[in-house]
């Protein structure tokens, strides 16, 4: 990911210093005092557009793979509402093997005993990939690209451990004109039973082999979607990038059991009296997703800073501020799936407005102005202890006053002077 987020930045003030440092990294110079715009400078409307792996999007908000991208009608709606890109629901060669059940969702609410009036903070699904015939989905991909040639349509694909099957799927999907692939290496339920989804994403040797097949065949950008159900998410992300993928998407859902009905003693969602662990999403996963994305971004900054790789953040995005957090941690784009299921496709307008408000507050003109800006403030706990001990030492010294002429420093000269004033 060749961007500011992977530059080596050492700043003291987390906001004002970042603005002053930006010109050092080839970004736009402007006349600023801190973040207050001078009277002679007219503030421009923030530009939300992004270019990722050569793909131009009007904003960084992407429909995540799932029900919001399940057919032509809903994907058309997403484009009409103004989403930056759409990732279709995952397809494979043989949809006949995909059999869904109902109910397939369960919700977790905040409040006393999960009151029905409480805010929805968690969402579990046991839904599989697309159960529609591949040929039908391919026709709809082609139709969408014909009707929206300037909009970005990304195909999410998944196959069994079979090189020929992967090659056939890639070839057939590419012929529709889609702009990129997102490889589903991360679905935590159902598909791993067929050595698909997370079964590949959790096995780095298997992942390396399959990524090799995919990238030898694909002629459009490839993103690898990571599973959070692993000890160190940077390991498969590194393997995917080293094996030819141009981008990483993280995270997919977290393996979970939503709860037990205390009247029936049966798990939720309950299908004929039984259930199975599923994928957890929505607001409650947001902090976990931020940590995973932060770790991936730091790895990419350290090991792939010269490459034009991308990072797509996923997990609990319902506001523009949620999105800003992912971008501050290095994400180029932000995906929304459960949020659309809860609030509708019109959510994108709110996301754009709130992200622009954040950018105006800090006088950021583009996404690149602040992408990755917060990465530098993550360190080890050992380093935090050292920093705090030093800060306490300095505060004590200032309160005590200077003991000798040798104690004067240039950096804290004014404070040092004030420390010896009596009134």
For each of these PLM feature ranges, what is it?
Residues 76-81, 139, 146-147, 154, ...:
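Alpha/beta enzyme core
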Residues 2-167, 351, 403-423:
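N-terminal capping/small domains of soluble enzymes
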Residues 95-115, 259-277, 340-364:
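C-terminal helical cap(s) of enzyme catalytic domains, especially alpha/beta-barrels
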Residues 64-65, 312-314, 336-337:
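Thr-Gly-centered strand-to-loop micro-motif
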Residues 2-44, 280-308, 318-423:
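Alpha/beta catalytic cores of nucleotide-metabolism and tRNA/nucleoside-modifying enzymes
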Residues 89-91, 185, 252, 338-339:
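Short secondary-structure boundary segments
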